[in-house]
């Protein structure tokens, strides 16, 4: 399954780039995240509760940054495992300046195995887009909050 998604942040690209790697910002941005830690540089592990139509399970996730080009590109390898099956994805994230802010484009190749394999692609694709959309809306809020808190701390 192929997924493509665009999100326009109301933030400069350098801020999005900086905070896109922050463990706390990411944990607070991931919908239904139960746990999320950076185990080594560019390697994250956690658990996410996913409830989409017939899919209802806790997934153990592993995210690895395979490649990055500061401040415009990430390649991620994502693995998610549950009783319902496994999800393997390679995702490319492109960040570019756009109208004084930042536009992020994701292109992902996803392979689903197990019980979830029989779920229609259009349902899985629609659900994946909704999760990604929520993630980046939350991420933008978390980045703004982190920037505000760091500026507030700097002033005091």
Language model feature labels by segment:
Residues 16-20, 26, 65, 76, ...:
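Hydrophobic pocket/interface hotspot
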Residues 80-127:
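Beta-strand/loop substructures that line and gate deep hydrophobic ligand-binding cavities in soluble
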Residues 9, 52-54, 69, 82-84, ...:
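A generic beta-sheet turn/junction motif
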Residues 116-156:
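A conserved amphipathic terminal alpha-helix motif
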